[in-house]
């Protein structure tokens, strides 16, 4: 699990002023915290964090003398310049189940001969913090046209420690035949 150092937010400055100085306003809430904590993170660290991790990823925040285990709950970017506006972290209680999402990463997409339809690339689930899944990898090498992969086909989601918030027969992806090839086959059959 990654660890990142954060500092308490300067309450005298508004969020807009912080962003101009290259600082991203953040917030930690939930878990065993009595109140939410306003924190700040420099922009370079925030960019690096969101490049490496995703929403739902577990991360340790080092704030002064304490370490808080959290997950990235939300973030927003400015539409105009694509800079991070804020990041929200949810503190995790080790004994309480938490809602999160697992991201599906596809490998060997170059080997797919048909059209790859990605239908459900974020799988919502609930689990204890120790059982959280950040990403699952699906290898597409050797998968023929007509292949359908459901949530139940991914072994990580069959664990008793995970409560899926979608049906196991929900389609994650399918490999369809290319439309041009189907049209040509129909024309050849007609001749």
Predicted features by range, described:
Residues 1-191:
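Acidic, negatively charged sequence tracts
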């Amino acid at each position: 699990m990654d660890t990142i150092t954060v500092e308490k937010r300067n309450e005298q400055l508004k969020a807009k002023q912080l962003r101009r100085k290259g600082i991203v306003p953040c917030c930690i809430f939930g878990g065993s915290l009595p109140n939410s904590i306003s924190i700040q993170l420099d922009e370079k660290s925030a960019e690096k964090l969101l490049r490496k991790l995703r929403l739902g990823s577990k991360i340790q925040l080092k704030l002064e003398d304490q370490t808080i285990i959290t997950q990235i709950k939300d973030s927003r970017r400015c539409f105009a310049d694509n800079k991070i506006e804020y990041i929200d972290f949810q503190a995790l209680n080790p004994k309480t189940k938490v809602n999160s999402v697992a991201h599906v990463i596809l490998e060997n997409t170059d080997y797919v001969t048909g059209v790859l339809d990605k239908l459900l690339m974020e799988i919502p689930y609930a689990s204890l913090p120790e059982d959280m899944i950040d990403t699952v990898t699906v290898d597409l090498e050797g998968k023929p046209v007509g292949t359908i992969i459901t949530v139940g086909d991914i072994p990580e989601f069959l664990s008793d420690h995970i409560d899926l918030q979608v049906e196991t027969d929900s389609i994650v992806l399918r490999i369809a035949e290319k439309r041009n090839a189907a049209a040509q086959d129909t024309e050849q059959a007609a001749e």
